[in-house]
């Protein structure tokens, strides 16, 4: 019995100490302590300690009685049997540097900011220089005159503005600044209104409504001058004018010097064939189509090895592309075989008035074997503007020589012939008469002293030497007003009716009648 009374007394003492600890905790919370447990538990006042000791000293087992259960909190302490301190009743206690806010528990990561991970830096070096990366480039087109004159940034709109309109002048520029300067210079010189910039999507190249179409002035028909022939019932439909901007001298010199300086580093889709005065480009698979087009317009291509989808030549003239496609589908059994385009071309010629000669090409198409590129070497480039004419004369002679060699080939199939382009391929059968006439017609139109847009005595002398090697006679007496007066020694004795049996064919305006010995 005494043991029970002692235990009850100890329980009472512990309850008193527990009340003291709770009081200290409440005081610490009220004072906003920064960290729990920073302040040590201090002893109570001497008066309270004396009360505890006196109670223990005067305690006797007979005085211990069971304490009735309290149903309500007392004045000095709470009922230990009631849950008076629940999590929802607890005041937030500062336990860290960041203030604890109840709303933070509803935020992601309880309101704690998560630092972003830094991007992993790649240690893999790029295979090619950043300058070699191709970026999209927008060209600007100036339509100087016509019903839709203006500055365009889309070739589709420019083509619609110039297609079928006679006398329209237009030009391509790399930047809007250059285009604006050229347009302002033109309007100032012609004293016309300033040309507006027409972005893509805003060009109104057709009537806006049916009423406007009815009120629009009718299109003037071309005046026909007939001499003894019946006028056609309707005007012929205008042919589609494909946009082929004239190459400038600056563009040509840039490509020329690029070919001379190229050493094969940085681009494995190109290699050059270097001669003493000129370097020609050879384009392999995945070459830049825009560069192929510009080099083609400059007459600086020797060979093209296109992919199966012909993406490298997609900017070449449409008829040339169609001829290549027909060769793949109709002339070879395995359409997956690689092909080549071997080009012999002249180069452009400029005078003070501007461009006087666009390159003329003879293109051979064939099945390509394994491509073994030649080593590209950086060559010395000393050419000046005044040397371009001499270079054009040299390439013109080589062009005529390669064109005359077609007469020695007995098995040729003509894929396409145009005013300034001849495309052919080898054939397993002999050349038919139709293809032979096409070659002769092209030679008649191209081979002359005026090949380069002006009369050139050097071309005439080259033709004279070439004809003499084949047993003919071709003499140039003198040049009068830019035209060569040419007379064949055997012209007087030959028949006057019908075409002369000649292999060296000259343009009709330069040679009234020519004849030479036919060499088999």
UniProtKB/Swiss-Prot annotation:
Protein name per Swiss-Prot or TrEMBL: Transactivator/viroplasmin protein
UniProt record similarity statement: Belongs to the caulimoviridae viroplasmin family.
Organism, scientific name: Cauliflower mosaic virus (strain NY8153) (CaMV)
An example Gene Ontology biological process: regulation of translation
Remaining remarks: The inclusion bodies are the site of viral DNA synthesis, virion assembly and accumulation in the infected cell.
GO cellular component: host cell cytoplasm
Organism phylogeny: Viruses, Riboviria, Pararnavirae, Artverviricota, Revtraviricetes
Protein's cellular compartments: Host cytoplasm
Function (record text): Enhances the ribosomal termination-reinitiation event leading to the translation of major open reading frames on the polycistronic viral RNAs.
Keyword 4Fe-4S annotated: no
